[in-house]
């Protein structure tokens, strides 16, 4: 059983751990292992402490252990027709494909709608094996960009849902 709730300050340590561990498992064939191994929990904790937790949700198990999170808010780049953004969604590898990602996405869609947003956009590294998670909910492919991390040039794709209400309905089926 998964519970999705708003993140609290006490969750930051767990969020940072999920963030680092998920990067290591998700991107191990995409980003150099030396870079991934250099990621540390304390730095991620500090980054999370400096941010607002508005629009951040955690997934926890029946014992209250946090194993995933997602972060949503206003779009950060200019993408015509989109006003909301999924900034990040990460789950520990052993808890993926069990419905928590869908539950986090549904909670975020609800949050964005309640705050006056009507659409949602997300950037995804094209080589990310979890891109199929997003594709399962029929987004439009609306942008492409390239960036470099640890000396590796990567392509990211911008996926969007122009009708957030329709996405919420799909997620809540």
Curated annotation (Swiss-Prot):
Pfam families: Acetyltransf_1. The keyword Protease does not apply. Keywords: Acyltransferase, Transferase. Residues 2-171 form the N-acetyltransferase domain. It comes from the Bacteria. One of its GO terms (molecular function) is acyltransferase activity, transferring groups other than amino-acyl groups. Its EC number is 2.3.1.-. InterPro entries: Acyl_CoA_acyltransferase (IPR016181), GNAT_dom (IPR000182). It is an enzyme of class 2 (transferase). Belongs to the acetyltransferase family. This is Uncharacterized N-acetyltransferase YuaI.
């Amino acid at each position: 059983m998964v519970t999705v709730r708003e993140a609290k300050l006490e969750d930051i340590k767990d969020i940072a751990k999920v963030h680092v561990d998920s990067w290591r498992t998700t991107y191990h064939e995409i980003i150099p292992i030396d870079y991934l191994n250099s990621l540390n929990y304390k730095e991620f904790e500090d980054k999370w402490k400096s941010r607002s937790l508005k629009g951040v949700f955690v997934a926890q198990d029946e014992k209250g252990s946090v194993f995933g999170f997602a972060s949503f808010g206003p779009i950060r780049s200019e993408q015509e027709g989109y006003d909301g953004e999924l900034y990040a969604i990460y789950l520990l590898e052993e808890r993926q494909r069990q419905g928590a990602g869908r539950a986090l996405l549904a909670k975020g869609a609800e949050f964005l709608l309640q705050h006056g947003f009507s659409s949602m956009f997300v950037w995804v590294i094209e080589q990310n094996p979890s891109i199929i998670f997003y594709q399962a909910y029929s987004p439009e492919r609306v942008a492409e960009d390239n960036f470099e991390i640890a000396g590796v040039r990567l392509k990211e794709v911008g996926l969007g849902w122009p009708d957030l209400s329709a996405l919420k309905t799909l997620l809540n089926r």
